Swiss-Prot record:
It catalyses: a quinone + NADH + 5 H(+)(in) = a quinol + NAD(+) + 4 H(+)(out). NDH-1 is composed of 14 different subunits. Subunits NuoA, H, J, K, L, M, N constitute the membrane sector of the complex. It comes from the Bacteria. It is found in: Cell inner membrane. NDH-1 shuttles electrons from NADH, via FMN and iron-sulfur (Fe-S) centers, to quinones in the respiratory chain. The immediate electron acceptor for the enzyme in this species is believed to be ubiquinone. Couples the redox reaction to proton translocation (for every two electrons transferred, four hydrogen ions are translocated across the cytoplasmic membrane), and thus conserves the redox energy in a proton gradient. InterPro entries: NADH_UbQ_OxRdtase_chain4L/K, NUOK/Mnh_C1-like. This is NADH-quinone oxidoreductase subunit K.
Amino acid sequence: MLTLTHYLVLAAVMFAISVLGIFLNRKNVIVLLMAIELMLLAVNFNFIAFAHYFGDTAGQIFVFFVLTVAAAESAIGLAILVVLFRNLATINVEDLGQLKG
């Protein structure tokens, strides 16, 4: 039987992997977006684990709101990525400094 601690350790490992992915990869925008999404999924995993452990549905409902915001963030991030690739022909984060408004 899996306890709450198992779920929290798994979520902490997922969160640590995503933070490590953000710090180690500073070049590719797609990998950065994937790491941020993994971070949000780890937080959602914690919400679901606590909601199941305490028998409350508020955590599960809050996950739907977080997933909605994450989907919007992904859509906006990918739209910005397409515009960057059209203008600069690259998706490197280092080249974002060339954008002038």
